[in-house]
Amino acid sequence: MFAVVAVFTALWCLGHPSGVSVSAGSGFYVWQRHWSDKVEAVVCAELEAGTHDLYVLGGELEYENGLARWRGANVPGHVWLHDRITAVFRLPVQALDNPGVSAARVISHAGTRGVHRIQLDVDVPERMIGRYAELVEGIRRRWPVGAGKLRLGATFLPCHLGLKEVRRVLAALDEPVIQLHGIDAPKNRVETWALMKRRTVFRALRAARALDGRFKMALPSYAYVLTFNADGGFRRLYAEGLPDNFDLPPGTVREIAVPDLDLLHEIFTSPLRLPVIWFRLPVRGADRWCLERETLSLLERGERPRATVEFTVRRGGREGTVDLIARYRHQIPLLGVTAAVDWGTCGMEGEFFPLNGCRVMGDAVHGQLPVSVSIAPFACGEPFLVGKAITGADPRRISMKEKEKGK
């Protein structure tokens, strides 16, 4: 598709701003608009580990009644001071109507954050790629000398890589990112859709490598949700958060698009792989629909994570009670599983109280422990209580095992 040597030479002659030919580091997007103590703790731990850069949502430009304003996340000020942090500014397509004015707004907003590592996130229509070039050129040209050395990144879609003027955009950047996931909204539930399409992914990786050796790839660690009206018509796509059922109109149907672990594994074992920026950083205790951190580490090492359910039985808080605990590993569970329970040598006498949406399989009998329990879906990697039991059995003698489907 592209002449690798000729294109690379042409781009190099234009002069890459950073003077770096290959981007080696991987990273995570931190896309929370409202930071909790858990988010801050996970971010600080990741910075302490020092293995990944973090790309933190630093502001979203919005237009209301023709007036532009920034909507920002409540990111703690100390986060912006770290040298592994890049501020991501999300701009609407409308910002490309006047690239010069938008460039000034980006520079001003970066100044309020005190950052000089920034990335632009814009869903650029193909016909406006030239305006995108004007925007990034304007930011670089107008960047204040005393604001620190600018490190400028920007996101691209696969459809951009074959456009002539994409080279002009790249010439003004330090860090280009190709987004390999996304869903084209279907008209109805009958149409097929996928979070990632294999053919598109590998075609984009080849094109990105041919264009510029500094590309990074953005990949999903997070599930997306499509909602459909009761008549089957498409309603809305949620790419950054999943509404609870009670937030949706009656009759709304949800379809969940989870990351394809087989395809992700194929990407990371391919010679076409690039440094990755995951969307997004998992936050234990706050993310129901995100793969766990360990899963992403395995993928980066070229290993295929195996989806399992771990079970633990421990002594309860009161004498004569036990807690049954489950933990989904390396998967974003959608339907839950059924677990068989072996209560050991003390027989089936006792009481069981299911929790967290779990339930007894079959009829619950007073004074008798269940032989199997339906385990509700839960956050990936998070241990959770399946239920509590009153029994004289030794917890060390009690075991749980996932039942095979159909048995």
Enumerate the predicted regions with their spans:
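Substrate-binding cleft of secreted/luminal carbohydrate-active enzymes
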Residues: 218, 222-224, 228-305
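Intrinsically disordered, low-complexity Pro/Gly/Ser/Thr-rich segments with frequent PxxP/GP/PP motifs
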Residues: 348-392
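Aromatic-rich peripheral "rim/lid" segments of glycoside hydrolase catalytic domains that contact
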Residues: 75-80, 282-323, 336
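Hydrophobic membrane-insertion alpha-helices, especially the h-region
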Residues: 1-14
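Substrate-binding surface in catalytic domains of secreted glycosidases
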Residues: 130-237, 241
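Asparagine-centered strand-capping/turn motif at beta-strand->loop junctions
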Residues: 318-335, 343-345
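Conserved, mostly hydrophobic/aromatic
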Residues: 54, 120, 176, 217, ...
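Chitinase-like catalytic core of GlcNAc-active glycosidases
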Residues: 22-32, 57-172, 178
